[in-house]
Amino acid sequence: MVSRRVQALLDQLRAQGIKDEQVLNALAAVPREKFIDEAFEQKAWDNIALPIGQGQTISQPYMVARMTELLELTPQSRVLEIGTGSGYQTAILAHLVQHVCSVERIKGLQWQARRRLKNLDLHNVSTRHGDGWQGWQARAPFDAIIVTAAPPEIPTALMTQLDEGGILVLPVGEEHQYLKRVRRRGGEFIIDTVEAVRFVPLVKGELA
């Protein structure tokens, strides 16, 4: 039994076109208020992005659901997340697959996310402090890669770390950004443009 606030959000997401009930169930299961500052707790279940510090944000639930749905996950999917951030998207993924790999360039955010995930008994996540542009070659290939910040172009390293049939979902662009889905098929990459979006930039390098 979910609260009225959670149910209202789920109804709104369905109205916005989210159809995957597994994704919606994952959103209902993850307490978004645990991933934001207490000052914003009353807005935790609003369908909006919220600041998490370090110039980063927690994405609006619609965008989390949309991007997750586009990955076409199964429980066996090998998943890489670029931009752990608050750990909220990571937690959604952890409810849907057996294991999640996640890379975060800001050390402080990585440690906060690890603590939150542990507190929620989500132990099927491996996090790494590093440059998201480079992916996680040692754990490749992946069936699904999700990027939660926008590079000006699709990073080559992420495309090459996709397994055959794998899907990469990410925002791309600077002033004007679009959500893209890249599917690796037969040695080729099929790129579809999904919709206009607004994300923080995917910065190269890493911060201590």
Curated annotation (Swiss-Prot):
Subcellular location: Cytoplasm
Primary subcellular site in the record, as a coarse category: cytoplasm
Pfam family, one: PCMT
GO MF annotation: an example: protein-L-isoaspartate (D-aspartate) O-methyltransferase activity
Location of the active site: S59
Cellular-component GO terms for this entry: cytoplasm
Enzyme Commission code(s) on record: 2.1.1.77
GO-annotated biological processes: methylation; protein modification process; protein repair
CDD domains in the record: AdoMet_MTases (cd02440)
The reaction(s) this protein catalyses: [protein]-L-isoaspartate + S-adenosyl-L-methionine = [protein]-L-isoaspartate alpha-methyl ester + S-adenosyl-L-homocysteine
Keywords for this protein: Cytoplasm, Methyltransferase, S-adenosyl-L-methionine, Transferase
Domain of life: Bacteria
Keyword Cell division in annotation: no
PROSITE patterns xref list: PCMT
InterPro entries: PCMT, SAM-dependent_MTases_sf
NCBIfam families noted in UniProt: pimt (TIGR00080), PRK00312.1 (NF001453)
Protein's job: Catalyzes the methyl esterification of L-isoaspartyl residues in peptides and proteins that result from spontaneous decomposition of normal L-aspartyl and L-asparaginyl residues. It plays a role in the repair and/or degradation of damaged proteins.
Protein family: Belongs to the methyltransferase superfamily. L-isoaspartyl/D-aspartyl protein methyltransferase family.
The protein's name: Protein-L-isoaspartate O-methyltransferase
